[in-house]
Regions:
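Electropositive, glycine-dotted interaction segments
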Residues: 112-175
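Extreme N-terminal "head/tail" segments of very large remodeling/mechanoenzyme assemblies
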Residues: 1-128, 142, 159
């Protein structure tokens, strides 16, 4: 009689498809961190530390947004708190960008506001390229993310049409 024991492995090995897709980084520009550029690596382990009210939970709340969660469902509106757009994208120059892999290629999706509405645009470049010094100097001149994307960035990279529906965005990002 032989002893047959199940083999248990604690090591997680992502599939080839998983290695070829997924969230890489989150970029915040003039968002809830006033007039700052913030880059957060989402690969491997990340340690977010800070005092109470520093924005750690607000940052973590952005991850479900990338995967298609309704933005206003992420922000608590109790006690007169701001909407998603008012909190995360307070000015026309504010933006959130998610850098991700799609079929092995680095791409970005940029969230921005215009007239209190949230919009999404896909850009066929890496975050490093999108936020290059030259591109950010141009953004400072435009001082409007919507115009910067369609009038400047679109000259060098494919920029999608503006999406105003989270459902449309979710369909694309989850496909």
């Amino acid at each position: 009689m032989s002893d047959i024991s199940p083999q248990i492995s604690n090591a997680y090995e992502p599939s080839a498809a998983q290695k070829a897709s997924g969230l890489l980084k989150i970029y915040l520009y003039k968002s809830y961190f006033n007039n700052r550029f913030v880059e957060v690596n989402c690969q491997g382990n990340t340690n977010n530390t800070g005092n109470n009210g520093a924005g750690k939970t607000s940052l973590l709340s952005l991850i479900p947004i990338f995967y298609g969660a309704e933005p206003n469902a992420v922000v608590s509106r109790e006690a007169g708190k701001l909407s998603f757009v008012q909190y995360y994208l307070p000015s026309p120059s504010s933006m959130i960008a998610f850098e991700y892999l799609h079929q092995g290629e680095e791409r970005c999706v940029v969230l921005y506001s215009n007239a209190s509405m949230l919009y999404y645009r896909f850009v066929s470049c890496s975050g490093k390229d999108l936020f290059s010094l030259e591109n950010m100097r141009a953004h400072a001149e435009f001082n409007d993310t919507r115009e910067w994307l369609k009038s400047y960035i679109a000259k060098n990279y494919h920029v999608s049409l503006q999406l105003s529906s989270t459902l449309d965005y979710r369909t694309i990002i989850q496909n």
